[in-house]
Amino acid sequence: MKEGIKCIFSRKIEGKIKTCTISRNPAGEYYVSINVETESSYPEPPAIKPETAVGIDAGVKNLAILSDGKKFPASDKFRKSERHLAHLQRILSRRTKGGKNWEKARVKVARAHNRILNQRNDLINNVVADIIKKGYETICVENLSIKDGMLQDKKHGKHNKQKRSRNKLIVDAAMGMLRIKLQQKCKSKGINFIKIERYFPSSKTCHCCGKIFKGLQLSQRSWVCPSCCAKLDRDVNAAINIKNIGISNSSLGRCTPEVKSVEHRKQKRRNAKSSDVSDVMKQK
């Protein structure tokens, strides 16, 4: 320790070092987390303009779909790593817990998990970097929840292969990780980041005339609007609607944590009024 520890730094350290934490993951790898204090501040985001804004729809087959038609396909390179992980887990299950061979197998399993995590992080970082490089001043996304996208089948439970397969694809897509990393990058670059409420029917609403097609099925990747006869790509149409609703509801002209739809706000006010009336009746 007197001679120091050799480290590989991901980037140059700027600012005054406050704390330094050394950690070790289950795979036996050591990391150093350095907390620094700097005088620099984040740039102020510009005013929101429709011509410099983009909407992003997250998906399973395509990780991100932009309102300008650009699609970032989800990678299937996890499959080979996951098959290798399953092989190592079978070996670990045959070892006696606490023994030397069990410990060796456990480390191999941990390294396989770490490899899959690194592959997923690399994919997300590349997608975020490509989006930021396009020079958008405003980015609108849907505040999705993984639980809302999961298929629930109480009748068949865990034995529904179709449900498990789709839920696995949703987890692999890492929609939450993409949104978090994109928001962090927007903050550091001075880009407006707008989240719209998750229950807005972005896929079922025609961006040309505003007609909502309630009969749209999940398997339909393209559809024709019954009102204006416009031919729509499901994902691109959703991204355009996300952009439009994000810009129209953002009256402040700055980045907002989450933009609620007009109907959502009206329902919230109605619920508040009904609760006030019930309180008055109780007092009487």
What kind of region is each of these model predictions?
Residues G4-C7, P46:
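Short aromatic-glycine motifs in intrinsically disordered, low-complexity regions
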Residues R11-I13, P26-K284:
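Positively charged, helix-rich recognition surfaces that bind polyanionic ligands
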